[in-house]
Regions:
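Metal-cofactor-binding active-site regions of metalloenzymes
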Residues: 1-303, 355-357, 361-373, 377-480
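Short secondary-structure transition/capping segments
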Residues: 43-44, 320-322
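C-terminal amphipathic alpha-helical interaction region
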Residues: 307-309
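Hard-cation-handling environments
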Residues: 313, 318
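Active-site loop ensemble at the mouth of alpha/beta enzyme cores that anchors a bound cofactor
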Residues: 322-334
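Divalent-cation-assisted or electrostatically stabilized phosphate/pyrophosphate-binding catalytic cores
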Residues: 336-343
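Short, basic/hydrophobic alpha-helical segments
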Residues: 346-352
């Protein structure tokens, strides 16, 4: 029997162990998509206890509204174990909340959360044991002592000891990027903290709050919008500002990726109707969103900004809890959508105008991996190897099986050697161990192919592939 999560954890062959320890493990991390707040990087926040880091909590904003923040992966684990909500997002003491989580984690056999937590405890706190209800007090005291006193466990310390080269935050076009500016001007901060341009609220024309958001965008750029091209012009202005602040990527969170025949007149008609408070049909909404995606794609190409598109998620499906806690609190699910024709049509339209940027396609539904894998090959060109990417196994797919499936699909239908690798998509500064888990699985997969005689034991070629997927492909892709 193997020891619990030892140095060769998940590395089943000597080749896998060699590839991981000698090539992959030592390389920097390019965390090109996450949700961590840049303010906490600049202020070098120190957390008081492990519950604050892992479970987050609740605060009342200046306008009196409630805001719930934290790791909703962990919140779902606790809810699945029957833990009352007051211990999850409520105001119960942190020690009691941590106890409930530890008791829940014990039941999470096979869940990636179990692996993530123990990798974090081992890497950042030197804890070699097992977290459960009985050891919760021991772990609580150990972690809190280190969090409060260890200079390596401030936010910047965590980033530095994790060997992070780049952090790609997620930012709204109306954001002032004040913290990115301060970070950029601070010579003591070595990591690249790059804002990512996420204009979801501009594209979601049929969702509640669209008109209110457009008014906020008008205030930021200092003019009113009479047409769809006015919106595009404002977005270009904001994108140029983001690029000045170091932006390397955009991000689009879409229920589905639309495409329909459209033009400026159709998009403007839909825009005016929405601003008047009228209800749009799906076709009208798609005409507007398609038009903006085409215009934005061309702008991303012009400014060398990567276009990320995430889709196939049904969000906030528990209406009662959504109204109580708001979005991003653990009440989303995988959707079944057929976007094969629309994605290919969108990329084709952009390519026809020589306006297709670098694109990363993520589906929350693993059933889409093969379809996306075949789309990639239809739109690659000589701008850069792997210009169109199959996004890393995302969210509910971020499991051992999900990562293996994504990598095997890419290997089977494209070039795994040009894959830009892992991202955390996280709100936690301890989550960089997810890159370790990915690298172990990647080296194990490649190691097994070599040991089985499916790829030669060519040291030079294997080194290039493993180091590329771990770091160098992303470094090139995001112009670091």
């Amino acid at each position: 029997m193997k020891a619990f999560m030892d140095k060769d954890f998940l590395l089943e062959t000597p080749t896998a162990q060699h590839l991981y320890h000698d090539y992959s493990a030592k390389l920097p991390i390019v965390d090109y998509h996450c949700h961590i707040p840049p303010q906490e990087i600049y202020e070098d926040r120190r957390f008081e206890n492990i519950a604050q880091v892992w479970l987050g909590g609740h605060q009342v904003l200046a306008d009196g509204s409630d805001y719930y923040f934290g790791d909703h992966y962990k919140w779902r684990v606790m809810r699945s174990n029957g833990v009352p909500e007051e211990y999850i997002t409520g105001d119960k003491p942190d020690r009691e909340r941590f106890q409930k989580f530890a008791e829940s984690l014990e039941m999470a056999i096979g869940n990636p959360m179990y692996t993530w937590c123990h990798l974090e405890l081992k890497k950042y706190f030197g804890y070699e044991g097992v977290l459960n209800g009985e050891t919760a007090e021991e772990v609580w005291n150990l972690c809190n002592d280190k969090l409060q006193h260890d200079p390596k466990l401030t936010v910047r310390g965590l980033i530095e000891q994790s060997n992070v080269a780049m952090v790609g935050t997620t930012d709204d076009p109306i954001d002032s990027l004040e913290w990115h500016k301060k970070i950029k001007e601070d010579p003591t901060i070595k990591v690249v903290v790059a804002p990512s341009f996420r204009p979801d609220k501009v594209l979601n024309i049929r969702k509640e709050g669209f008109a209110d958001y457009i008014h906020k965008l008008e205030e930021v750029v200092g003019r009113k919008f009479a047409c769809a091209n006015c919106v595009v012009s404002a977005l270009e202005e904001r994108l140029e500002f983001f690029v000045e602040m170091g932006c390397r990527a955009s991000d689009h969170g879409l229920d589905y990726i639309p495409f329909t025949e459209t033009n400026a007149e159709k998009a403007t008609a839909a825009f005016k109707k929405a601003m008047a408070g009228e209800t749009l049909t799906k076709e009208e909404g798609d005409e507007y969103t398609t038009y903006l995606l085409l215009k934005l794609g061309a702008l991303y190409k012009k400014h060398n900004v990567v276009m990320q598109m995430h889709y196939s998620c049904l969000r906030n499906v528990n209406d009662k809890m959504y109204r109580k806690l708001g979005p991003d609190t653990g009440f989303d699910m995988i959707a079944v959508t057929d976007c094969s024709a629309t994605i290919s049509s969108l990329l084709s339209a952009l390519t026809k105008e020589d306006a297709c940027p670098k694109v990363i396609l993520y589906s929350l539904n693993p059933a889409d991996f093969d379809m996306l894998g075949t789309i990639l090959g239809a739109f690659q060109d000589d701008e850069i190897p792997g210009k169109i990417q199959l996004g890393s196994a995302w969210w509910f797919c971020d499991t051992d099986d999900g990562m293996y499936q994504q990598m095997k699909t890419l290997a089977r239908l494209g070039l795994l050697g040009n894959f830009i690798g892992m991202l955390t998509d996280s709100r936690s500064f301890l989550s960089y161990t997810r890159h370790e888990l990915f690298r172990r699985l990647m080296c194990n997969l490649i190691g097994n192919w070599v040991e089985n005689g499916q790829y030669p034991n060519d040291e030079k070629a294997l080194k290039k592939i493993v180091e590329g997927i771990s770091y160098y492909n992303a470094k090139r892709y995001f112009n670091l």
